[in-house]
């Protein structure tokens, strides 16, 4: 379980991110056209931005597709990323099948999770879920009480 931000370990931020696709050259060149001259330049830029924002004590919930890299490349990357990492496994996270990654760099690796964050229920999945647990719950002000966070969709839902 992911602890509530600001409890248990002192003050920290929790970030949610998806579809970084480290080491995915075609994503840079053809699919998302990220505009970097090389995959190495893309990786270096994302790593620099990540570590400029995320402190070592912060938590990062990754909603899948962290890395398209080989196991050794991904392991090196993981050791350079700041933060306590939680992984919702995506369809491109091939490295998760390698038991070498079931080590303390990830607090956990799962396909689905429900947690509390800032007094809200959060549903986590790499894929969008049309009807998710608690989606119709409202608080006394009529505001949503449950949020679905997902990745996978890079452009529009109809793709």
Q: Residue spans of the language-model regions?
A:
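Alpha-helical hydrophobic/aromatic positions enriched in membrane-embedded helices and signal peptides
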Residues: 11, 57, 142-144
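Conserved beta-sheet core of the metallophosphoesterase superfamily
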Residues: 103-159
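Short, Lys/Arg-enriched N-terminal segments with co-localized hydrophobic residues
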Residues: 1-12
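Core catalytic region of metal-dependent phosphoesterases/phosphodiesterases
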Residues: 15-18, 22-117
